[in-house]
């Protein structure tokens, strides 16, 4: 009996971050591969000025400071990222840390607003 691709995607989508990490390790062991990202060097030369003129489309939301109300900030981080309680607490305790990466401007602004409403200091890069 073959498993449909949709069933696999649904099962993976329902997993926690910890379960996904264990799954990746199992794939690495079973197939002898690495999940490390491959770094690709960009073209060198005089094109640097043109790249700066392009509008940025992906943003990173950085938690700068947790503030006085850590519990609310941890709840906001969990809501934004889907992390478990311990992972969210570690992220908040380790500030400054990125909360969301490579997101559109609207999503980044919304995440920053939620963090600030919870009492944290956040910035968008």
Swiss-Prot record:
The role this protein plays is: Forms part of the ribosomal stalk which helps the ribosome interact with GTP-bound translation factors. Is thus essential for accurate translation.
Q: Name one GO molecular function term.
A: mRNA binding
The lineage's top-level taxon is Bacteria
What is the protein named? Large ribosomal subunit protein bL12
- Record's subunit section: Homodimer. Part of the ribosomal stalk of the 50S ribosomal subunit. Forms a multimeric L10(L12)X complex, where L10 forms an elongated spine to which 2 to 4 L12 dimers bind in a sequential fashion. Binds GTP-bound translation factors.
GO BP terms in the entry: translation
Matching SUPFAM superfamilies, A to Z? ClpS-like (SSF54736), Ribosomal protein L7/12, oligomerisation (N-terminal) domain (SSF48300)
> What Gene3D superfamilies does the entry give?
3.30.1390.10, Single helix bin (1.20.5.710)
Cystine residue pairs? none
Q: Which NCBIfam families match?
A: L12 (TIGR00855)
The organism encoding this protein is: Paraburkholderia phymatum (strain DSM 17167 / CIP 108236 / LMG 21445 / STM815) (Burkholderia phymatum)
Keywords assigned: Ribonucleoprotein, Ribosomal protein
Q: Name one Pfam family in it.
A: Ribosomal_L12
Mention any one GO cellular component term assigned to this protein in its UniProt record: cytosolic large ribosomal subunit
